[in-house]
Structures are given as structure tokens and as C-alpha cells.
Design a protein with these regions (language model features):
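Acidic, glycine-enriched active-site microenvironments
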Residues: 1-187
Length: 187
């Protein structure tokens, strides 16, 4: 296939700010104007998961984006109680991921993307349902960003009202600090 000097670039199938096209027909329809070729397989993909991005810092890999190959492996929360209620933390609007906790375990979602895109928002909601199903979780508390106009905040408000769940608002800088503490076993 390759001739000397040929360069192939292969990447996940999506345009900027759109969810990955994980069905062959969808990819060929949405991307035919920008892709030279499609490498497909007869093994069906059940769930879209974007690429992980890591960087080597101080000789060790560090996540810039924890996704394919690393999720949904949990992060152990050092300070969490075994009987703590299940919490769904809905994430921000840009570069969204969400987190579901179960006792001392935090299950981070894959990178979902920017929720302003309607298809990405629909994917976000589908992935939440998927996580709740595969981990047999039913949130007892929702947490969302303090920003009132974020679509993830709107999702949390609507779901809390619909299901009668308590809702906690979190300033996003606080959420960032908490996630770094958890990643390093300090939360």
C-alpha cells in the first residue's frame, strides 16, 4: 500500500467540535468531502471513544486528555467513604467529560467535546446513560458547573428537577483543583 516517501495520516473520524462517527455509514456520509479514503473493518464499534492525549513530563506520562485506553478504569478516591452516595458530576461545556462516583471509585468519562454542538450534546446524554447502565448506577446527587448558561448545567438542572435529586453547583476552578488532588491520591 505504501510507497517510499508516502505519508498516511489516520485519525478518529470527526470534524472539529463534532462527536466521532463510529458507524461506517455515518463516517462515509459526514466526511466524504474531506477524507481521501476510509479504512473500515467488519467488526462493529459499539461505543465512540475519542483519542487519549498524553505528554511526557519529568520522564513520566501525564494526561492532557484521559480517554481511549484509560476509561472507564476508575480513579480511587482516598478520602471517599465506601457507603457514599452515587454522584454524577456533569462537567463543563467546553472539552467536556463527566464523572460518576461509586463509593471510593470515580469513573471518568471519555473526552466528549464541546457541548454547544447539538450532536455532541446528544452524545453526552447517551454516554451518561451508558455509564449508568454498565456500572448499574443511579445517581443520588448531581453536581454541575456554577455557570448558569452551560448546557451541562442545564442538563443537571433538568434532570434534578425531573428525578427529584439534590443539585450542587461547583465553581469550575474548584472542580479542576479537586480533580488534580484525586488524580494524585490526595482527595
Amino acid at each position: 500500500l505504501l510507497q517510499p516517501g508516502d505519508i498516511w495520516i489516520m485519525t478518529s473520524a470527526n470534524r472539529s467540535d463534532e462527536p466521532i462517527a463510529y458507524k461506517d455509514e455515518d463516517a462515509m456520509e459526514r466526511l466524504r468531502a474531506i477524507a481521501d479514503a476510509f479504512l473500515i473493518h467488519n467488526r462493529e464499534i459499539a461505543h465512540r471513544v475519542d483519542d487519549s492525549v498524553l505528554r511526557i513530563a519529568a520522564g513520566a506520562p501525564r494526561f492532557l486528555r484521559r480517554s481511549r485506553g484509560y476509561v472507564p478504569a476508575p480513579i480511587r478516591l482516598a478520602a471517599a467513604e465506601t457507603e457514599a452516595p452515587v454522584v454524577l458530576a456533569c462537567g463543563a461545556e467546553l472539552k467536556n467529560t463527566f464523572c460518576v462516583t461509586k463509593g471510593p471509585l470515580a469513573f471518568l468519562s471519555e473526552h466528549i467535546g464541546d457541548l454547544a454542538n447539538q450532536a455532541t450534546l446528544a452524545s453526552y446524554e447517551d454516554i451518561i446513560v451508558h455509564y449508568e447502565k454498565i456500572f448499574t448506577l443511579q445517581p443520588r446527587l448531581l453536581a454541575c458547573d456554577l455557570h448558569p448558561d452551560y448546557l451541562s448545567t442545564g442538563y443537571a438542572r433538568q434532570r434534578a428537577a425531573r428525578e427529584g435529586l439534590p443539585l450542587t453547583y461547583v465553581q469550575h476552578h474548584h472542580a479542576h483543583i479537586a480533580s488534580v488532588l484525586a488524580e494524585h491520591g490526595e482527595a
